Amino acid sequence: MTVEEVRGSLDLTDNGAIRNSIRNCLTVFQNDPYLQGAIRYNILTERIDIVKPLWWEKPTATLNDTDFNYLMLYLEDKYGLTSEKKIEKAISIVADCNKYHPIRDYLNSLKWDGTERIRYALTRYLGAEDSEYTYECLRLFMLGAIRRVFKPGCKFEVMLCLVGGQGAGKSTFFRLLAVKDEWFSDDLKRIDDDNVYRKMQGHWIIEMSEMIATANAKSIEDIKSFISRAKETYKVPYETHPADRLRQCVFGGSSNTLDFLPLDRSGNRRFLPIMVHAENAKVHILEDEAASRAYIDLMWAEAMFFYHNFPVRLTLSKEMNKELKVLQKQFMPEDTKAGLIQSFLDNYNGTQVCSKLIYAEALNHPFDEPKQWEIREINEIMNNSIEGWTAFSNPRIFAKYGRQRGWERAASGNEPAATGSILPDGFRELTEEEARQMELPF
């Protein structure tokens, strides 16, 4: 429709003037030859965008006060519509009727050529080891990013962590992986910031640089909790009530420090560390930025193929989780206490131990009674960091330490663990008959 045709379709007052109504404003936005299709609601940023070029310069697509003033001037000049509130409401309605998600649109536009690239990307650009672990971690991260876009708020609790020297290209890799610079952010420095949602809003991949490496014991638990969160409850300035904002982003970590992970014997399962070596990279990621971006487009096309054609599990495989647990030890501070206990057990003649025995003999506290937190720490070390020993749940009698739960040396080959026999370290396991006589439950 031409401007004249649109003007002729507007409702009039009894006096024949164009009515200043929301309906008339809406008709203009939906049919004017310049404004038709120009105003859309961006689901990613939760803001209104102007998505086609108009007659003034705009640095970004997001509708701002200046844009609104230009639109008011145009409606006043061409249609005699002057009610600011009604124009504002009409903009809100027309935008809501034309929602779009730029990342979904981008991902849905991609076509994979059948060549694997995710498997080799970190080796190609950052010199990471070419391994199944490297491949699975990057693929998981990309599939999590896709799922978060198509199903905001879905459960995704892992952070891909790139570890290596300064200037290796870690941050650049995350930035280019986000496709557009406005979909990437490295501005999240504190997770207790009142404006944390606003710093995440509109971004797809958020880099947390060195945050984990500088965290203390309390803040690392806060970081774990933060990564696991599926939403933020937040009130933007122009709203009356807080609302749940489902997450559409994923988090990447980068560190120049090798032992960046906290000492956590129960496992840092949320953090997927990958060591990078810039000197081993086949191509520097900024050597030909256009070529790197084209390569990354095809990585996302590959990830979308997997997303649509195979069941998506946003966790590592069981085998890879075992490898992760071993690998993570390289990125944690040395566990000196676990080392002392392992050395003691490797030279220990007995086949069964309890936490009190470990405290007294391995940690050299023969005359002290362990505190509860020390018992918990020993249990954590024995259950997570010690090799060659397995826990037993039925309490057994220890000569010096009474009736205790503990651990027994893992049997070698098909040799069964000894039961009911006198052991060289001064204790023996009770038989069921002896336990019944002593009224000890098994």
Q: Which stretches of residues belong to each language-model region?
A:
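Conserved AAA+/SF3 P-loop NTPase catalytic/coupling segment centered on the Walker-B
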Residues: I205-I227, L261-G267
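Conserved alpha/beta core segments of nucleic-acid transaction machinery
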Residues: F306-G350
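Conserved catalytic/switch belt of AAA+ P-loop NTPases
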Residues: I220-A243
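A short helix-turn-beta junction within AAA+ P-loop NTPase domains corresponding to the substrate/partner-engaging
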Residues: L263-A281
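Short helix-coil junctions and helix-kink-helix linkers
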Residues: E361-E369
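AAA+/SF3 P-loop NTPase mechanochemical coupling elements
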Residues: V196-Q201, V236-S254
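P-loop NTPase catalytic core of nucleic-acid-dependent motor ATPases
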Residues: I91-Q201, I205, K356, L363
